[in-house]
Amino acid sequence: GKVKYRGKTISTFRKDKGSAGKIGVLVQNPLCCFVMDSVAEELEATAKAYKLPRSVIEEVIDIMQLQSVLGSNPYDISGGELQRAAIAKLLLPEPEVIFLDEATKGMDAFFKAEFGALLRRLAARGTAIVLVSHDIEFCAEFADRCAMFFNGTVIAEGTPQDVFLGNSFYTTSACRISRGIIPDALTPEQVIDYANRCERKKNDD
């Protein structure tokens, strides 16, 4: 088969210098993205390759909260920090399409929420995002559409509600806990919202 983007096959697309940076890929092992001795040098080299101003580097550093690791070797920082640094490098040229492989691996709950909000902002401005992940909780909260693969075949496809609500095994903890009590709850926020609405109704009565 062929993979096409904007009418061009990927092989043709890669040879088009004007298309450089339009497709971004984050591989499962983010160390593969680094060749320089520090995170700062890596970002600067990438920005130089795309002829980007310093302000763009500073923006992604701020977005991904990398100030504390800029002088560190990529091999010396934590998995979550490395993941954030790799995503920062990916975002520098402002790609139109982003492929992410296990992007939330190593991230704590706080930064997962921050990262999910970032993906929403990117999607809102027209960036297409394809995420491969085993993090069902993250997908349920932040994905617009999901597809579940088993043995190389798509066995379910649709909104997170379509894919996860009726699934007994591949679903979120919130869904398992609230099933039969709270309708259509996939995330902790939805469970909390339902409880708050019940409490308000009780007080009103």
Spans of model-derived segments:
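Catalytic Walker B motif of ABC-type/P-loop ATPase nucleotide-binding domains
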Residues: I98-D101
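H-loop/switch region of ABC-family ATPase nucleotide-binding domains
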Residues: S133-H134
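Conserved ABC ATPase "signature" region
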Residues: L52-V69
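Conserved beta-strand-loop-alpha-helix hinge in the C-terminal portion
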Residues: T153-R176
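A short, surface-exposed alpha-helical micro-motif characterized by mixed small hydrophobic
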Residues: C139-E141
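Conserved ABC ATPase signature
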Residues: N73-I77, E81
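ABC ATPase nucleotide-binding domains
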Residues: Y170-D205
